[in-house]
Design a protein with these regions (language model features):
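Ligand-binding clefts/hinges and TM-proximal coupling segments of bilobed small-molecule sensing domains
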Residues: 40-51, 185-201, 238-242, 269-298
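Short helix-initiation/N-cap motifs at beta->coil->alpha
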Residues: 109-120, 199-213
Length: 298
């Protein structure tokens, strides 16, 4: 029995599919629309097909155009333009480039914006999708739709070395300052914490540098980013708060996803089908391993 057919995989698949059905259900209005001609797909990938994709013709329009416009916050290690080569790189970049091949989309055009500008940019029609690591929230779900889950990671807290800060929660930082990137769900947590002074940032490096310089008491952000920044900048006097208990639990709603306009149901369903294939073919595991994420992320 291969991995795809194993009981363990089927159990996990059922859980993820249940989460996806709950969080990104297809509106009934689109279900009633007449189905357009089936979009093209690359049949050379075993087991991948779009035979029952429903909705409008949003994928077909992109296929005819030959290009999908993706926005990213240029955030290592997720989705960024390499400073040396200009290549679209990172965990999400590799997932999306493979998905584009599966869906016969000839060109992926990447545009960088601040994190809090990605969803507004999609809603305004400047981008076809958010191609960066982003999570479900009830507020976002009111205006956009989400793809099938991709991978998981939690947040961590970073402070200046020898600061003496040893807390379990953000709320225990009362009387101190705490920062994160604007537009993230972490920013919502910090702003709701009584007595905690919130400071928002446009990029993770500036966030962590303020902690290292003493301008900010603590930073809460994605564990992979924090570890990477500390590894690449050993001169910064930083440490992870080992007593901090992450609020991000490993459940379907906390997996990273991609964001689309609600009306683009064919495109959403097609990308979800491609991501599902990447998950259960084992390709996702290989991508995550390449970027230093272990089995806990899959």
């Amino acid at each position: 029995m291969n991995e795809k057919d194993s009981p363990l995989t089927l159990t996990r698949r059922s859980a993820l599919m249940a989460g996806t059905a709950l969080l990104a259900a297809v509106p009934l209005g689109f279900m009633k629309n007449a189905q357009a001609a089936l979009p093209a797909f690359d049949a050379s990938y075993p087991g991948f097909a779009l035979a029952d994709i429903i909705g409008d013709d949003s994928l077909e329009r992109i296929q005819r155009k030959g290009e999908i416009i993706v926005c990213t916050s240029n955030d290592w290690p997720y989705s960024y333009l390499d400073a040396n080569t200009g290549a679209f790189s990172g965990i999400d970049a590799e997932i999306l480039l493979l998905a584009a091949k599966l869906l016969k989309i000839d060109k992926v055009t990447v545009q960088t914006v601040p994190f809090d500008g990605m969803v507004p940019g999609v809603l305004a029609g400047r981008f076809d999708m958010v191609g960066d690591s982003i999570h479900f929230s009830p507020e976002r779900a009111k205006v956009v739709d989400f793809s099938f889950p991709t991978y998981f990671y939690a947040e961590t807290m970073v402070v200046k070395k020898d600061s003496g800060i040893r807390v379990n929660t953000i709320e225990q930082l009362s009387g101190k300052s705490c920062g994160t990137l604007l537009g993230t769900h972490y920013s919502e947590w910090i702003q709701k914490a009584p007595g905690v002074q919130f400071k928002g940032y446009k990029d993770a490096e500036a966030l962590v540098q303020d902690v290292a310089s003493g301008r900010l008491d603590a930073a809460v952000y994605d564990l992979p980013v924090m570890v990477g920044l500390m590894k690449n900048n050993p001169q910064w006097p930083l440490e992870i708060v080992t007593t901090y208990q992450a609020r991000t639990l490993k459940i379907p709603s906390n997996y990273s996803r991609y964001i689309f306009k609600q009306k683009d149901q064919q495109l959403i369903n097609a990308f979800s089908r491609a991501i599902e294939w990447i998950q259960y073919s084992g390709q996702m595991r290989e991508i995550l391993k390449k970027w230093g994420l272990g089995e806990e992320a899959n």
